[in-house]
A protein has these predicted regions:
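Collagenous Gly-X-Y triple-helix signature in extracellular proteins
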Residues: 2-203
Length: 203
């Protein structure tokens, strides 16, 4: 018997998102007119499907202080968040990092790849998000459609000047913090009903 697979398209409201499942895509228009695609990555986790421009982790070649001290954190939560629609900003649930909170954040090495030696002593590791278990979903393209490497928030545990990143082919690596590279951020949303292939790991 033949089968057919269809993809539903419907209007979307950040305040009342309805039932979502990993892999669902949400097309949104930024305040500067650019169109971006967000994707459901795990229970309560949404992130960019591809890259939103380029930025450095720090002005200098250092990873001292990790995510909490880096320039990328400031850039996302001051400049990038100002581009998001007000309805989306209102729906975002801040995420705690130690004693501080961020609405937007980069993914950690473990959230993308699962267990990895470079960050084994990093307390800010999390667990691998369901979406990234498929290596193809780790490959991100820029506005021209070209695959490019992109930053993670995890400092390289064996280096004082580099952060982890994802190669253009989806593999793991790290690079000096002052280099400009792809930006792919994530966020939590306030409330929704999710469908997931397996239960969400505890945070």
């Amino acid at each position: 018997m033949a089968t057919i697979t269809t993809k539903e398209t419907r209007a979307f409201n950040w305040a009342n998102p309805g039932t979502l499942k990993v892999g669902d895509e949400i097309v949104e228009t930024l305040k500067d007119g650019r169109e971006v695609v967000f994707v459901v990555m795990d229970d309560g986790v949404i992130g960019l499907k591809n890259l939103l421009g380029y930025h450095r982790m720090n002005k200098e070649w250092t990873n001292e202080g990790g995510w909490l001290a880096c320039d990328m954190r400031r850039y996302l939560n001051e400049e990038v968040i100002a581009l998001l629609p007000d309805a989306l900003i209102a729906a975002i649930k801040p995420r705690k990092f130690g004693e501080e909170e961020d609405k937007l954040w980069l993914f950690s090495e473990m959230e993308v790849f699962g267990e990895h030696d470079w960050t084994e002593n990093d307390p800010d590791r999390g667990f691998q998000f369901e979406y990234f278990k498929d290596r193809r979903n780790r490959i991100k393209v820029d506005e021209d459609g070209d695959a490019h490497w992109w930053w993670e928030r995890s400092p390289n545990g064996s280096s004082s000047n580099s952060f982890c990143h994802v190669y253009s082919n989806g593999d793991a690596s790290s690079y000096s913090a002052s280099y400009t590279s792809g930006v792919c951020f994530g966020f939590y949303i306030q409330s929704s009903i999710y469908e997931s292939a397996e239960p969400c790991a505890p945070r």
